[in-house]
UniProtKB/Swiss-Prot annotation:
CDD domains xrefs: LPLAT_LCLAT1-like (cd07990)
Organismal lineage: Eukaryota, Viridiplantae, Streptophyta, Embryophyta, Tracheophyta
Tissue-specific expression: Predominantly expressed in pollen.
Entry protein name: 1-acyl-sn-glycerol-3-phosphate acyltransferase 3
Membrane topology annotation: Multi-pass membrane protein
Length: 376
């Protein structure tokens, strides 16, 4: 069912803003009073607190937009996911690839302990960015001189992580668009690299740093290749708010970290070869409608996100009822104006989150930066 997204903005915006601020405040309190004494206990508490917010987006994906995921994976990998630390390496084709990762993490019980390496602007996003900062996400400035130490410090903090975690890394550095593809093809021509058709050229320095620093305590890399099912609309947050469904094909392959090369150049080449393989796989799918030779599994939607949203909604309705009772007693133009201002803030917050996810607003491909991050 497709409905005008504007009709959903205000109620969902109010719900997300109120619940998000509550979650952020709780995170702040535990960050101040627990983390200085026990980082392990803080992380366990924060996992459950953060999920109270993040599950609302899972609900939007699963229950409101009813987006379907076809998971292609072998039996051995399916048995291990969610039971071991992993570095998740994926291509970056849509505005909600990060949310697809959250959906998969939620299915295997590690949503609240899922992590990612992101651009620093993300941590300033209202509600969601703040929750990520409290959850040990690693934020980069896209300047290797500054980011090298940031990455090493971030990886060091993960050594004693008390729960199974997934660390996501989008090595293409930006979302796939036709404009960025053309820039990548031009760069490939200059550097005598294979010309990509369906992926961008990976920026390998961050990946090399990750493998070098975490291979002693992270046993696996989950190699994810995803794309929208043929003839389905590309999912976006705006389309999700409209209740517009879609279908995602996701392949997961597990690589043992111990089997990766030991040298930096070898690790970088391994990453580049991996994306050449992804490119060929996607080309085969787009031309022959054959996505993967692995067994496909249907990912059923869980009940937990729905329960969390219902509880938050009940809290909001009860609070709104009490507010209306209070307004009927002390009603004045100032109070009414304050109420309207709050609704406007909720709407603006949702608009900021939606715009921040749009591929048109992501960082454009820059060959000088790419040249810094791709090993020669």
């Amino acid at each position: 069912m497709k409905i005008p997204a504007a009709l959903v903005f205000i109620p969902v915006g109010v719900l997300f803003l109120i619940s998000g601020l509550i979650v952020n405040i709780i995170q702040l309190v535990f960050f101040i009073i627990v983390r200085p004494f026990s980082r392990s206990l803080y992380r366990r508490i924060n996992k459950n607190v953060a999920e109270l917010l993040w599950l609302q987006l899972i609900w939007l994906f699963d229950w409101w937009a009813c987006i379907k995921i076809n998971l292609y994976v072998d039996a051995e990998t399916l048995e291990l996911i969610g039971k071991e630390h992993a570095l998740v390496l994926s291509n970056h084709r849509s505005d909600i690839d990060w949310l697809i990762g959250w959906v998969m993490a939620q299915r295997v019980g590690c949503l609240g302990s899922s992590l990612a390496i992101m651009k620093k602007e993300a941590k300033y996003l209202p509600i969601i960015g703040w929750s990520m900062w409290f959850s040990d996400y690693i934020f980069l400035e896209r300047s290797w001189a500054k980011d090298e130490n940031t990455l090493k410090a971030g990886f060091k903090r993960l050594e004693d992580f008390p729960m199974t975690f997934w660390l996501a890394l989008f090595v293409e550095g930006t979302r796939f668009t036709q404009e960025k593809l053309e820039a990548a093809q031009e760069y490939a021509s200059i550097r005598s690299l294979p010309s990509p058709r369906n992926v961008l050229i990976p920026r390998t320095k961050g990946f090399v740093s990750a493998v070098s620093e975490i291979r002693s305590f992270v046993p696996a890399i989950y190699d994810c290749t995803l794309t929208v099912h043929n003839n389905q609309p590309t999912p976006t947050l705006l389309r999700m708010f409209s209740g517009q469904s879609s279908e995602i094909n996701l392949q997961m392959r597990r690589h043992k970290m111990s089997e990766l090369p030991e040298t930096d150049d070898g690790i970088a080449q391994w990453c580049q070869d991996l994306f050449i393989t992804k490119d060929a796989q996607l080309e085969k799918y787009f031309t022959k409608d054959v996505f993967s030779d692995l067994e496909v599994h249907q990912i059923n939607r869980p009940i937990k996100p729905l329960i969390v949203v219902i509880i938050w909604l009940g809290f909001l309705v009860f609070g709104g009822f009490k507010l209306l009772q209070w307004l009927s007693i002390v009603a004045s133009w100032k109070i009414i104006l304050l109420f309207v201002f709050f609704l406007v803030i909720a709407t603006i917050t949702m608009q900021i989150l939606i715009q921040s996810s749009e591929s048109q607003r992501s960082t454009p491909a820059k060959r000088p930066l790419q040249e810094q991050l791709i090993s020669a």
